[in-house]
Regions:
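Short, acidic, small-residue-rich periplasmic hinge/interaction motif at the N-terminus
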Residues: 33-35, 44-46, 76-80, 90-139, ...
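Short acidic/polar hinge/loop motifs at secondary-structure boundaries
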Residues: 63, 186-215
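Extracytoplasmic beta-strand/coil segments of soluble accessory domains associated
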Residues: 130, 147-190, 207-208
Length: 489
């Protein structure tokens, strides 16, 4: 396998541009503006049919080097219309191109996707079938959780587990280990085949959701056979040279059928607050807290029992980052405290003796990521994540006549399941030439589990190497071969 991979790499390297392009280079600079005169950030400026180019920063300025000669300059991005014009690059003078005006394309901006792509691009140019739920759609739907956000999406089916109080989902008719949940491109750990992590994310912190249908096993592993759902969170607005701040709050109340009690108890109750600071030196801070109170739904049941279990969630998060022209580094911590309540009635013989089977979950998710664009040809993404998931089953008995409460001593009535995981990923995107790009990557995952049904504290670790290439001989055709090899212990 390793020999075959090396052969593929050597074949790809054989298409490197001619050494003639390594002549003496001169400096090229300028700035890009929008039609209203504002700086246009993150616009790609390149010389057509070459590997020379750069990207505008937060002030719209760009700078790169290229050999002297006559070229066609291309100014484009997924958020703006493409613009081309002839230029002459000469030695001994300043090659400055001021106030290059581009026209923004709002419709195209809404279709930008990143999941499974070599670089951000419009949805119509993706080789995969990708759907995106953007920030405007999220605001219009006013969801209380991720399930209510995705339950109207085509190809997604939700199912409620009455016994555990959890919601599972299917993508393209496949569920469990065939669908991968990502947060900012990092896999989320789950207790089993049920993807409960999807219901344990704060919907108020989501910028957009990208749904990729079809196999993504080369990049994300064999458990992405049906596809992936990538939850992309809100971050700083980017480097702008100015200090800004924001504060937001949200209160939402809903009935559950005909059942409702104001602010607490029956019905659905959501309160959220978030704040952010962006300093002119590139530092940014974000934080927020959300409370989800689901009073459950009794339906046709009587007494204490509920057809849908009540659930109370507290979600907190914080982020600190630094962003400049070609670098974005950030750390994020998410915390979940979830309680799913299972009240039961007493028996006909002892109606005053009732039991409660509750599920108590705590989840910590740490993420450290860095995006570094070295030049117009090479960019690198580094990611490190530590996740700690703990779920406790607690069964108690209560004597309603005396108020006495005690833990149940029955088998399997008390249980603790815990998973810990380290995940590290490194990917690079290398534009070898105008028609071919290469994306190698390395992923390491270490997982430890323990619980009542697990013998001891076993660990699983695997190291994977993957490489993918994209060859685009014509504008209407793209070919993307890929291979993934892994070692598991």
């Amino acid at each position: 396998m390793i020999k075959n991979i090396c052969t593929v790499i050597l074949l790809l390297l054989s298409v490197l541009p001619a050494a003639g392009q390594n002549r003496v280079k001169v400096k090229i600079s300028g700035n890009v503006i929008t039609t209203d005169g504002a700086p246009a950030e993150y616009i790609t400026v390149s010389l057509k049919n070459t590997v020379f180019g750069g990207m505008s920063d937060g002030d719209g300025n760009f700078e790169f080097a290229a050999p002297p000669g006559e070229y066609t300059m291309v100014v484009q991005s997924v958020t703006a219309h493409r613009k081309e014009f002839p230029v002459t690059i000469e030695t001994g003078r300043e090659n400055v191109f001021p106030n290059i005006e581009v026209k923004e394309d709002i419709n195209q901006l809404e279709e930008v996707v990143v999941t499974g792509q070599f670089s951000p691009q419009s949805m119509k140019n993706s080789l995969y079938k990708v759907r995106s739920v953007n920030s405007d759609q999220i605001r219009q739907k006013a969801p209380l959780d991720v399930q209510s956000l995705l339950n109207t999406e085509i190809g997604i089916r939700l199912s409620n587990d009455m016994a555990l109080g959890e919601t599972d989902f299917e993508l393209m008719g496949m569920s469990g280990n065939n669908v991968k949940i990502l947060m900012d491109g990092i896999p989320m750990i789950d207790r089993g085949s049920t993807k409960q992590s999807l219901s344990q994310l704060d919907v108020n912190r989501i910028e957009r959701v990208e749904i990729v249908e079809g196999p993504m096993s080369v990049v994300y592993g064999t458990d992405a056979l049906a596809g992936v759902i990538n939850i992309i969170t809100k971050k700083g607005p980017g480097y702008s040279g100015e200090s800004t701040w924001r504060v937001g709050a949200r209160i939402q109340e809903e009935t559950m059928g005909k059942e409702y009690q104001f602010f607490n108890g029956e019905g659905l109750h959501n309160e959220s607050i978030d704040l952010g600071f962006n300093l002119k030196n590139g530092l940014y801070f974000n934080g927020g807290y959300t409370r989800n109170d689901n009073g459950g739904w009794q339906g046709d049941l009587t007494g204490r029992e509920k057809r849908w279990h009540p659930k109370d969630q507290s979600l907190a998060n914080g982020m600190i980052g630094f962003q400049r022209r070609n670098l974005n580094v950030w750390y994020r911590l998410d915390f979940l405290d979830e309680k799913i309540f299972g009240p039961l009635n007493g028996t006909a013989i002892e109606p005053e003796k009732v039991s409660d089977k509750d599920y108590l979950t705590k989840r910590y998710t740490h993420q450290l990521q860095a995006d570094w664009r070295l030049d117009n040809r090479l960019s690198v993404n580094l990611a490190l994540s530590y996740q700690d998931y703990k779920r406790r089953t607690q069964t108690t008995w209560t004597d309603l006549s005396t108020g006495e409460k005690w833990l149940s001593a029955e088998d399997a009535s008390q249980d603790v399941t815990q998973y810990k995981a380290w995940i590290a990923r490194a990917t690079a995107t290398w534009n070898i030439g105008p028609k071919i790009s290469l994306q190698p990557g390395l992923e390491y995952q270490w997982t430890e589990g323990k619980g009542g049904r697990i013998d001891g504290t076993p660990t699983i670790s695997d190291l994977a190497f993957f490489i993918s290439a994209e060859y685009k001989p014509w504008s209407w055709m793209s070919v993307r071969p890929g291979v993934r090899a892994f070692l598991m212990a």
